[in-house]
């Protein structure tokens, strides 16, 4: 699969083909300082044209909280195929739990390409006809 990618400028670190794993790291496009309890959109310096029928899932790297003390406010970002303009640059929505500095080039999040959900028709019924499994957190408690 080929994906067209545009970089914010010539100083952005180019994304190389991944050698292992299923996720591709993204880097901060500029230095960002965030105070505790502050929200900022961290620019990632890339815009992409995703293939028709696909979307990108963007999540923090496993070390993002440890290294920077930030969490991604929407848990997982979804970028669909329509977000593909020359100025549709990607961002990481960060909420800081401590004062922090993210430097240009720091690996802050990762993404993978996924097929979009097919068209779904929801059919209302009075009963599903299945046994109840249990509530939240009930798996493995019996």
UniProtKB/Swiss-Prot annotation:
One of its GO terms (molecular function) is magnesium ion binding. DUMP binds at residues 62, 74, 83, 91. It catalyses: dUTP + H2O = dUMP + diphosphate + H(+). Disruption phenotype: No visible phenotype; double yncF-yosS deletions (both encode dUTPases) are also viable. Binds 1 Mg(2+) per subunit, coordinated entirely by the nucleotide and ordered water molecules. It holds the Pfam family dUTPase. Gene3D superfamilies: 2.70.40.10. SUPFAM superfamilies: dUTPase-like. Optimum pH is 5.5. Pathway: Pyrimidine metabolism; dUMP biosynthesis; dUMP from dCTP (dUTP route): step 2/2. It comes from the Bacteria. Its cofactor is Mg(2+). Keywords: Hydrolase, Magnesium, Metal-binding, Nucleotide metabolism. Homotrimer. Involved in nucleotide metabolism: produces dUMP, the immediate precursor of thymidine nucleotides and decreases the intracellular concentration of dUTP, so that uracil cannot be incorporated into DNA. The Ser-62 side chain changes its position upon ligand-binding to make contacts with the nucleotide phosphates. This is SPbeta prophage-derived deoxyuridine 5'-triphosphate nucleotidohydrolase YosS. It comes from Bacillus subtilis (strain 168).
